[in-house]
Amino acid sequence: MFRILLPILLLFGIKGYAIEAHHAEYMLSLHESSVGSDIYEVEGKSVYKLKKECSGWNASEELLVFFKTKNNGQSKLESKWKTFETFSGEAYQFDLIDKINDERTNNFFGFANISSENNNAKYFSDKEYIVPLENLIEFPITQLKNIILAAEKNKKIYNSNIFMGSELLDGHRVVSVIIGKQKKYKEKIFEDKFYEKLYWPINLAYYNPEQESEKPEYRISAKLQKNGVLIEYIIFYDNFSIISKLSNIEQIDDSNCVDTN
């Protein structure tokens, strides 16, 4: 459900597309809840780490979210997600563990490759599963880099197919991105090199190509800076939405490798 958080948290430097290795913390809360929703309160935290290795990027996210419903119910979601994407954007690995109310609901790992004619993803859980992929697939880092490139060129729309490996046996999603005109922040939030004066308002809609529906599965509204940092973003589901605000960010050391990107 919240696996979209990981790709949207990646930090990119436009100059040479140098990714900043970092440790970031986001606080999650309920943004809006419609009349038909039972959810009236959301509290959570996401801890994200990005590390540059010799041939690609290691990323990890630990998520803890509490939901409260109108009938005095409460549920807890815990998630640990790790990924690795090569600099070329042709190979991708993923590892996921999910728990709901301390009961494990997801536990799998896998990899995907789009460098050959027979592109596919392999999932390993109780057994091995193979999912074919279309040729024009992007993994999370590649997709976000291309969104930033489109914004730099003053393009208003960017469309792509993304594979995340966020659900067992899941294929790709079709993503439509609307890029708004660059704006200034009303106030300065962080005294940090990651924080800039300007941002692009972007809106992303995620569609399942296997479902004949014009309605997206979910949407994201975010403030995207030129260096790739997202200070705030909102995830819209059917009858409620969650807002995530950056609460802390720190630079961490890269591995001792020659910069090949």
Which residue ranges define each predicted feature?
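Sec-dependent N-terminal signal peptides
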Residues: 4-13
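A short, structured loop/turn motif at beta-sheet edges
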Residues: 18-21, 49-58, 84-90, 192-195, ...
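Mature, soluble, non-transmembrane domains
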Residues: 97-261
